[in-house]
């Protein structure tokens, strides 16, 4: 059945509220539908989608559903058609009894916005009930002397239907003694009465049988009958009379069972049996005999069951008093039940979200519930509260509906579960309350990035580590949960020395363990700067970075490397020159060594292991300087052999040795003469001496020509390098000198004097060689390490410690640096007296040729053996570049002597203790020139 026009009016209000943006709850009206009772399940009631201004498909999308307060769901929503239909058979009499109008009210909830819309459905009565008498046999006793016109009440029929479908009329079967009169009460109930039309004669007819028919006004009408048996008795002049025509009593609903409510009382003036009055219920529903008891003798009415105001608040019944012969009268009894506060409030959850995300906006509805109290008046007035320290509040909706909404931002990391206590309290005395707990889980959102305990770390690993070794454990924490807290680790893409970081180290993405992918070499790589990123698995993922400095620790894996004297490529031994006039402390040469390691592993000490003449020479423990320990004697051999050991201070220490050959003579010719005198006068090879001499002369000529060409090339190269150094001098000016071991000057010296002419002393056949240039790797810049260990070891250098003079530590100075005159180069470009001389004119060249020819002649005579060292090129002190410290850049700026205040210097006075002999060499050269 379609909605009545009144429903259409509300529909108009609803549509108007949508157009104006006004919530439906603001309208005071309700949507009204009507439907007949006893319709089939699924019968159409109204187009709810249209009346709500929705499309049928939107009912499911927006969560539209019915909220009913009763226990039985009478109606349902057809989601496909958008209509309101019956959920089953509806019996109007069961729902509304005999109320004139039967309205069923419920609410429609739209869950997406938590809005409620009140709905009323009127149940239309149909004629589905037949009027029925409480008893099919009605017994009436009438005295035979009863005057005509006396009326006798009859039991009325009941019809649960209402309106025209209810009881409308009574009919009495035709007879000559009685007629029927119908009376209407205040509630429009029709009461049949039997009217005596003629005097009865008991002797004529003792019993009269009549039929009473009750009919309703339905279409078609329905009816039922009752049999009336009228018994004619002897004369009974008086009928019982009640003391009150109507009895009223008010009792609280919590009276105990068996409580006497009231007593009805009737008086019969007759005597004997005619005056004995009995009481009985006359007009009651089937439920009343179970609720109340009427004492037939005393007229007391008491309770058989407990009263419940919430179920029935008012009872109406009729009692009759009858004497012995059968005369009776009636009275009405009204029982009013008073409400007491015996029902606690009830909370009915309509909609509840058990879990909400922590980033839920403020004002979000998380629960919708209904409060009710079955009591009445103040006993039924309910208030609801929640604790004040929660980020929620209550908002009242229509009727007794409440919303629970958020008032503050939620944070799962602070509190992940809320136990919300709803306390509903009524207004009774004393008040009753009921608590309902709502457990609200706060769902996690990815709002916390992973965090490291520190923003940067320093990690150390010793070099020569095995591949795959674990270096460090990186850990990060994420305060989120589940996938949002799953952390993966990664290394930022970067390059180190032209190679990607992933070729050096790797990280386990799950555990954060950092692994070495290669064995590190301190001399090649000392530090790696890494950036570790921690990602969580949220959506979108969050990350944080941490910087990690990986330092490679040095190990003593490199032995000392001797830079000077360098080993000749032909296997010969270099020779150094010591004049016989040298005083004690005269600097003969200097052993220069470096160690690619750093710190204590690179601290070097020098020791004279073996000498052909013990006590003649001494080696500086930290400087490597070879000096005369005493004055040279005539008995000292011309050729002295020294074995010098260089050892670092690592654990375990590593060492290297070098063999030095020192010629004791004042000049090269003297060396040649002395060496020639040592050779035997004749030998097995004299027969080809002439051939050797010819070959030697030719060779010397070729060598001289090559020497001149090489000398010119070196000059050009030096000039070119000087230009480059001047251009780059500004870039190197800011580099601290402490960052270099001191090898650059040595390398420059070796590059300058790498071309040597060497005459072997071990072969009878003298020859010339051109050694290959020496190439020295540049040392890696390193920071000095602070150590407390002694520079000397207690095992290898014990005896050196005993002879080591105490040295006072002094601040470093720069007097060891080369002057312009001390830098390597040809003698012609230098003017100092302390520098070695080179042939720089024709006379010197002729002298060199003459000396070589003389040497060749002596070799042909078998009277001498020429020998040359790498430092002298096999020539005399006059023509050979006398090796002094001016030619070798000092590295002692990087040498720290533990426990002393001395800083190694290169001052000529400190080194030799006397003026250099370079000036004498120049004088000799001038004398020879004049002589020639």
From Swiss-Prot:
Keywords: Calcium, Cell adhesion, Cell membrane, Glycoprotein, Membrane, Repeat, Signal, Transmembrane, Transmembrane helix. It comes from the Eukaryota. Residues 805-841, 902-932 are annotated as: Disordered. GO terms for cellular component: plasma membrane. One of its GO terms (molecular function) is calcium ion binding. The chain crosses the membrane at residues 693-713. It is found in: Cell membrane. Glycans are attached at residues 419, 545. Its main location: membrane. InterPro entries: Cadherin-like_dom (IPR002126), Cadherin-like_sf (IPR015919), Cadherin_C (IPR032455), Cadherin_CBD (IPR031904), Cadherin_CS (IPR020894), Cadherin_N (IPR013164), Protocadherin/Cadherin-CA (IPR050174). Residues 29-692 are extracellular. Pfam families: Cadherin, Cadherin_2, Cadherin_C_2, Cadherin_tail. Residues 714-932 are cytoplasmic. GO terms for biological process: cell adhesion; homophilic cell adhesion via plasma membrane adhesion molecules; nervous system development. This is Protocadherin gamma-A7. It comes from Homo sapiens (Human). The lineage of its organism: Eukaryota, Metazoa, Chordata, Craniata, Vertebrata. The gene is PCDHGA7.
């Amino acid at each position: 059945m379609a909605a009545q026009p009144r429903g259409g009016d509300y529909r108009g209000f609803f549509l108007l509220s949508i157009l104006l943006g006004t919530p439906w709850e603001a309208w005071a009206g309700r949507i009204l539908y009507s439907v007949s009772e006893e319709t089939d399940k699924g019968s159409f009631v109204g187009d709810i989608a249209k009346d709500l201004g929705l499309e049928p498909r939107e009912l499911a999308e927006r969560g539209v559903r019915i909220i009913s307060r009763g226990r039985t769901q009478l109606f349902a929503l057809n989601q496909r058609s958008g209509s309101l239909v019956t959920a089953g058979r509806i019996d109007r009499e069961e729902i509304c009894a005999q109320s004139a109008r039967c309205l069923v009210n419920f609410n429609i909830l739209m869950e997406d916005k938590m809005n409620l819309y009140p709905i009323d459905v009127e149940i239309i009565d149909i004629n589905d009930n037949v009027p029925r008498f409480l008893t099919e046999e009605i017994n009436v006793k009438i005295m035979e002397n009863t005057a005509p016109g006396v009326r006798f009440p009859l039991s009325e029929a009941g019809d649960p239907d209402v309106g025209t479908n209810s009881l409308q009329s009574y009919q009495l079967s035709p007879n000559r003694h009685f007629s029927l009169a119908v009376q209407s009460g205040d509630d429009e109930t029709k009461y049949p009465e039997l009217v005596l039309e003629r005097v009865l004669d008991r002797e004529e007819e003792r019993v009269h049988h009549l039929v009473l028919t009750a009919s309703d006004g339905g279409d078609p009408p329905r009816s039922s009958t009752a049999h009336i048996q009228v018994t004619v008795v002897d004369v009974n002049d008086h009928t019982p009379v009640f003391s009150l025509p109507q009895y009223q009593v008010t009792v609280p609903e919590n009276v105990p069972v068996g409580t006497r409510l009231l007593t009805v009382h009737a008086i019969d003036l007759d005597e004997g049996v005619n005056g004995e009055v009995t009481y009985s219920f006359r007009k009651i529903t089937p439920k009343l005999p179970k609720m109340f008891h009427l004492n037939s003798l005393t007229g007391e009415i008491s309770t058989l069951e407990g009263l419940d105001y919430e179920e029935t608040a008012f009872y109406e019944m009729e009692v009759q008093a009858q004497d012995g012969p059968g005369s009776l009268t009636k009275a009405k009894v009204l029982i009013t039940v008073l409400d007491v506060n015996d029902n606690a409030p009830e909370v009915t959850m309509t909609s509840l979200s058990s879990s909400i995300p922590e980033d839920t906006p403020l004002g979000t509805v998380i629960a919708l519930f209904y409060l009710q109290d079955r009591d009445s008046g103040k006993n039924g007035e309910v208030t609801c509260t929640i604790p004040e320290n929660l980020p929620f509040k209550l908002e009242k909706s229509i009727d007794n509906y409440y919303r629970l909404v958020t008032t503050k931002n939620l944070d799962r990391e602070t509190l992940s579960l809320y136990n919300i206590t709803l306390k509903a309290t009524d207004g009774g005395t004393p008040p009753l309350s009921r608590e309902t707990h709502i457990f609200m889980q706060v769902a996690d959102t990815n709002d916390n990035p992973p965090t490291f305990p520190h923003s940067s770390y320093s990690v150390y690993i010793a070099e020569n580590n095995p591949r795959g070794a674990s270096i460090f454990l990186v850990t990060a924490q994420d305060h989120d949960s589940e996938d949002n807290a799953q952390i993966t680790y990664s290394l930022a893409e970067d390059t180190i020395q032209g190679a990607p970081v992933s070729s050096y180290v790797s990280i386990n993405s799950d555990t954060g363990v950092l692994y070495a992918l290669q064995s590190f070499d301190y001399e090649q790589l000392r530090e790696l700067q890494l950036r570790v990123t921690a990602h969580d698995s949220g959506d979108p993922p969050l990350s944080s970075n941490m910087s990690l400095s990986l330092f490679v620790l040095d190990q003593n894996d490199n032995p000392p490397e001797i830079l000077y004297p360098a080993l000749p490529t032909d296997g010969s031994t270099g020779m150094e020159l010591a004049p016989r006039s040298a005083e004690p402390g005269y600097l003969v040469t200097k052993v220069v060594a470096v160690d690619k390691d750093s710190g204590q592993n690179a601290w070097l000490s020098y020791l004279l292991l073996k000498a052909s003449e013990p006590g003649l020479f001494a080696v500086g423990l930290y400087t490597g300087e070879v000096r005369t320990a005493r004055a040279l004697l005539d008995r000292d051999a011309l050729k002295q052999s020294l074995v010098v050991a260089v050892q670092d201070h690592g654990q375990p220490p590593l060492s290297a040795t070098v063999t030095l050959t020192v010629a004791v003579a004042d000049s090269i010719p003297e060396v040649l003469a002395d060496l020639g005198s040592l050779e035997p006068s004749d030998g097995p090879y004299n027969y080809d001496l002439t051939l050797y001499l010819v070959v030697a002369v030719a060779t010397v000529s070729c060598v001289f020509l090559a020497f001149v060409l090489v000398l010119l090339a070196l000059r050009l190269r030096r000039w070119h390098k000087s230009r480059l150094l001047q251009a780059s001098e500004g870039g190197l000016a800011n580099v601290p000198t402490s960052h270099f071991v001191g090898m650059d000057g040595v390398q420059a010296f070796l590059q300058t004097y790498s071309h040597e002419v060497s005459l072997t002393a071990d072969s009878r056949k003298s020859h010339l060689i051109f050694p290959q240039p020496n190439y020295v790797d540049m040392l890696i810049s390193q920071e000095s390490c602070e150590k407390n260990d002694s520079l000397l070891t207690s095992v290898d250098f014990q005896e050196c410690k005993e002879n080591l003079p105490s040295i006072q530590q002094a601040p470093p100075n720069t007097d060891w640096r080369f002057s312009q005159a001390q830098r390597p180069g040809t003698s012609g470009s230098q003017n100092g007296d302390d520098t070695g001389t080179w042939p720089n004119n024709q006379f010197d060249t002729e002298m060199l040729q003459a000396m070589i020819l003389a040497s060749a002649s002596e070799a042909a005579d078998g009277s001498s053996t020429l020998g040359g060292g790498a430092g002298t090129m096999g020539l005399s002190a006059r023509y050979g570049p006398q090796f002094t410290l001016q030619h070798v850049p000092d590295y002692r700026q990087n040498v720290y002597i533990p426990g002393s205040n001395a800083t190694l210097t290169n001052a000529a006075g400190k080194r030799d203790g006397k003026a250099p002999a370079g000036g004498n060499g120049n004088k000799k050269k001038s004398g020879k020139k004049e002589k020639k």
